[in-house]
Swiss-Prot record:
Family matches, as Gene3D superfamilies: plastocyanin oxidoreductase, Single helix bin
One of the record's GO cellular component terms: chloroplast thylakoid membrane
Mode of membrane association: Multi-pass membrane protein
Subcellular location: Plastid, Chloroplast thylakoid membrane
Annotated function: Component of the cytochrome b6-f complex, which mediates electron transfer between photosystem II (PSII) and photosystem I (PSI), cyclic electron flow around PSI, and state transitions.
Protein name: Cytochrome b6-f complex subunit 4
Stated family: Belongs to the cytochrome b family. PetD subfamily.
Chief subcellular location: plastid
A GO MF label: electron transporter, transferring electrons within cytochrome b6/f complex of photosystem II activity
Residue ranges of the TM segments: 36-56, 95-115, 131-151
Top-level division of the source organism's lineage: Eukaryota
Length: 165
């Protein structure tokens, strides 16, 4: 490969550049030509070879074969629409369901304005954005899992029983 040059940390010029956050060109292995000419093509060709090999050796069907005379018992949307489907399925009023779906992007648009005071990038130092993300993720997973269950078990995920009056 290439020649790796060890840095001389006693060099005052290098120490001054390292103190300013510079000086990375003085040591290490160069990206050109080692990475760009030798490593990247091997990785790219290896990835292509693995994909072609898997496609040839184990071809998979795209979905089930179509049968126009057999309707499935329950028609479900694609997996990324499960939370929205669950909202529409459980909310009795359709207008309220549409308003709930519109409130999700509207709420996400307000988060930068709530967090505008905080300039940190670390999520542990941005509590509002982190809390909104965690609560949104839990609710989306809860609704997504509930959409795959029958309607009577969808809100509780079958974990506990709610007695209706």
């Amino acid at each position: 490969m290439g020649v790796t040059k060890k840095p001389d940390l006693n060099d005052p010029v290098l120490r001054a550049k390292l103190a300013k956050g510079m000086g990375h060109n003085y040591y290490g292995e160069p990206a050109w030509p080692n990475d760009l000419l030798y490593i990247f093509p091997v990785v790219i060709l290896g990835t292509i070879a693995c994909n072609v090999g898997l496609a040839v050796l184990e071809p998979s069907m795209i979905g089930e074969p179509a049968d126009p005379f057999a309707t499935p018992l329950e028609i479900l949307p694609e997996w990324y629409f499960f939370p929205v489907f669950q909202i529409l399925r459980t909310v009795p009023n359709k207008l309220l369901g549409v308003l709930l779906m519109v409130s999700v992007p509207a709420g996400l648009l307000t988060v930068p304005f709530l967090e505008n005071v905080n300039k940190f990038q670390n999520p542990f130092r941005r509590p509002v954005a982190t809390t909104v993300f965690l609560i949104g993720t839990v609710v989306a997973l809860w609704l997504g899992i509930g959409a795959t269950l029958p309607i009577d078990k969808s809100l509780t995920l079958g974990l506990f029983q709610i007695d209706s009056i």
